[in-house]
From Swiss-Prot:
GO terms for cellular component: actin cytoskeleton; cytoplasm; nuclear matrix. It is found in: Cytoplasm; Cytoplasm, Cytoskeleton; Nucleus matrix. It comes from Ogataea parapolymorpha (strain ATCC 26012 / BCRC 20466 / JCM 22074 / NRRL Y-7560 / DL-1). This is Cofilin. It holds the Pfam family Cofilin_ADF. InterPro entries: ADF-H (IPR002108), ADF-H/Gelsolin-like_dom_sf (IPR029006), ADF/Cofilin (IPR017904). Controls reversibly actin polymerization and depolymerization in a pH-sensitive manner. It has the ability to bind G- and F-actin in a 1:1 ratio of cofilin to actin. Binding to F-actin is regulated by tropomyosin. It is the major component of intranuclear and cytoplasmic actin rods. Required for accumulation of actin at the cell division site via depolymerizing actin at the cell ends. In association with myosin II has a role in the assembly of the contractile ring via severing actin filaments. Involved in the maintenance of the contractile ring once formed. Its main location: cytoplasm. GO terms for molecular function: actin binding.
Length: 143
C-alpha cells in the first residue's frame, strides 16, 4: 500500500508480468479505480508504434503506464529494450487527481520489479520518443 492507502490490483501485477516475461503486451496504462482505493489496468496494447502509446494517454487526466521501449544502440550494436515506467500528470489535470496519483505512485512502482527507467510527464513533449530515448541514454551511459 502507498501513503494514500491505495493498493495494487492482482490484475495490474499480472499484466506487468505478461509484458515483462511473456512479451504479451507492448504497453499497459494504469489508473485508479473510481473509489480511488486500487490501481487497476486501464488498457493494454500490443501496438509497436510509440506514438500510438502516447496517444492513449489522456489529455486531461493522470495515469501510470509501462512501455517496453525498444531503441537502437549506437555503432551498430543492435537493438535494446528497457521497460519504462511513466507517471503521467498533465498540467491540465485537476490538482486533486495530481495529488492522489503522486501519493499513490510508490505502491505501483515498488510492485513492478524490472523497471529500467522512470519518466514523469506533465505534457506530451516530456514523453515524446526522443525525450525518453535521451533519458534512457543518460541512465545507461549510451550516447
Amino acid at each position: 500500500m502507498s501513503r494514500s492507502g491505495v493498493a495494487v490490483s492482482d490484475e495490474a501485477l499480472k499484466a506487468f508480468n505478461d509484458l515483462k516475461l511473456g512479451k504479451k503486451f507492448k504497453s499497459i496504462i494504469y489508473k485508479l479505480n473510481d473509489a480511488k482505493t486500487e490501481i487497476v489496468v486501464d488498457s493494454t496494447s500490443t501496438e509497436d508504434a510509440y506514438d500510438a502509446f502516447v496517444e492513449d494517454l489522456p489529455e486531461n487526466d493522470c495515469r501510470y503506464a509501462v512501455y517496453d521501449f525498444e531503441y537502437e544502440v549506437g555503432q551498430g550494436d543492435g537493438k535494446r529494450n528497457k521497460i519504462v515506467f511513466y507517471q503521467w500528470s498533465p498540467d491540465t489535470a485537476s490538482v486533486r487527481a495530481k495529488m492522489v496519483y503522486a501519493s499513490s505512485k510508490d505502491a505501483l512502482r515498488r510492485a513492478l520489479n524490472g523497471i529500467g527507467t522512470e519518466i514523469q510527464g506533465t505534457d506530451f513533449s516530456e514523453v515524446a520518443y526522443e525525450s525518453v530515448l535521451e533519458k534512457i541514454s543518460r541512465t545507461t551511459g549510451l550516447h
